[in-house]
Design a protein with these regions (language model features):
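Short acidic/polar active-site loop segments enriched in Thr and Asp
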Residues: 32-33, 68, 111, 155, ...
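Active-site acidic/histidine proton-transfer and metal-coordination neighborhood
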Residues: 64, 81-192
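Alpha-helix N-cap and loop-to-helix initiation/capping positions
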Residues: 46-54, 85-97, 126-137, 166-177, ...
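Acidic/histidine-rich catalytic cores of soluble enzymes
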Residues: 3-4, 139, 148-244, 304
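N-terminal pre-domain/capping segments
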Residues: 1-110, 187-194, 287-310
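Active-site beta-loop-alpha junctions enriched in small/polar residues
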Residues: 8-12, 38-42, 74-77, 118-120, ...
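Conserved beta-strand positions in the central sheet of alpha/beta enzyme cores
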Residues: 36, 71, 114, 158, ...
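Short amphipathic alpha-helices and their capping/turn segments at secondary-structure boundaries
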Residues: 20-27, 48-66, 96-109, 143-147, ...
Length: 310
């Protein structure tokens, strides 16, 4: 299968809430089929009847428009310690939370859920023995989630490499090392990385660790979903692919596609993960600039727009 283009719903959180409003906007205005749904739209911590009702409503909107939820990801308000939390009861809460999230995404037709592998506190990260203990604990937590996710019908889990050590995967080498360890853990379903070409430790002595094209060459065989945004030298944010940012940005479609192909990309999902501050005039530019970003990539990667019915 060829590459497909998708959209992470981070920038739509709080700007949309009702399933029909969200999905109609994606289909009608953004013209993209595949969506990585962030948890804020159907939060696993909400009461069961609310989750079931909103999942039904979301499913109906998907069927009506042709939009597809391909995966579920924690959103802007879900970047938390999770399985790196030092308290066992808090970790237990998040095991159950992610099991519910797996059920929601499976019911919507998605194939995977994920977040960061774990986020450690300063105290725990700076103690090598404690750090190793929590890595083992986090893998055990993910193993329990994986068994549940398999029963729910998901195909894999994913973890997002970040840009600092205590959030894991901050360099290409550390990213590959953790992935090797997760593969060796032999979970009930695989746990792959979900790399972001704009992440990486800016203090690394290896320039590849902050080079979007080096990441694109390194990860496709291990990262079914790859986050992209317009990358600036200052790593200053999740910039959209608009004319203004493209004039100064590092990411060009032809060059990125070449790097991905060199890395073995075949049927990867290339996911736009963008953001705008809650400031005017940016706040009201979100839909138009998302649409511009989708249109920028659509000639190069299948957006699925032909399958939409709205």
């Amino acid at each position: 299968m060829p590459l497909t283009l998708s959209l992470n719903t981070n920038p739509l959180v709080n700007r949309f809430a009702e399933p029909d409003d969200l999905i109609d906007t994606i289909a009608r205005d953004l013209r993209i089929r595949d969506v990585q749904l962030t948890h804020e739209f159907i939060n696993p911590s909400w009461p069961g009847p609310v989750i079931r009702r909103l999942t039904r409503d979301m499913g109906a909107a998907l069927r009506r428009t042709g939009v597809r939820v391909t995966s579920g990801m924690t959103g802007p308000y879900g970047r938390l310690n999770h399985f790196g939390h030092p308290d066992a009861e808090v970790r237990r809460y998040y095991i159950d939370w992610f099991k519910t999230f797996a059920d929601i995404i499976a019911d919507l037709g998605g194939q995977s859920v994920g977040t960061q592998f774990a986020i450690l506190t300063y105290k725990d990260y700076d103690d090598p023995a404690r750090r190793e203990d929590l890595i083992r604990i986090a893998i055990d937590c993910w193993a329990e989630v994986a068994a549940h996710a398999k029963a729910a019908g998901l195909s894999y889990l994913f973890w997002e490499p970040m840009s600092i050590g205590r959030e894991f995967g901050e360099t290409i080498r550390s990213c590959l090392d953790l992935q090797q360890r997760l593969t060796a853990a032999d979970l009930a379903i695989p746990m792959w990385m979900m790399a972001d070409i704009d992440h990486g430790d800016v203090t690394s002595p290896d320039p590849d660790d902050t080079d979007p094209y080096a990441w694109a060459r390194a990860v496709p065989r291990l990262s079914p979903i790859i986050h992209v945004k317009q990358s600036m030298m200052d790593k200053g944010g999740h910039r959209p692919f608009t004319a203004q940012h493209n004039a100064r940005g590092r990411v060009q479609p032809e060059r990125l596609l070449t790097a991905l192909a060199e890395g073995g990309a075949r049927d990867n999902e290339i996911c736009l993960e963008l953001s705008w501050k809650e400031r005017e005039p940016d706040d009201r530019r979100v839909v138009a600039e998302l649409a511009e970003s989708v249109a920028y990539w659509a000639p190069h990667i299948d957006s699925g727009a032909a399958d939409l019915t709205t």
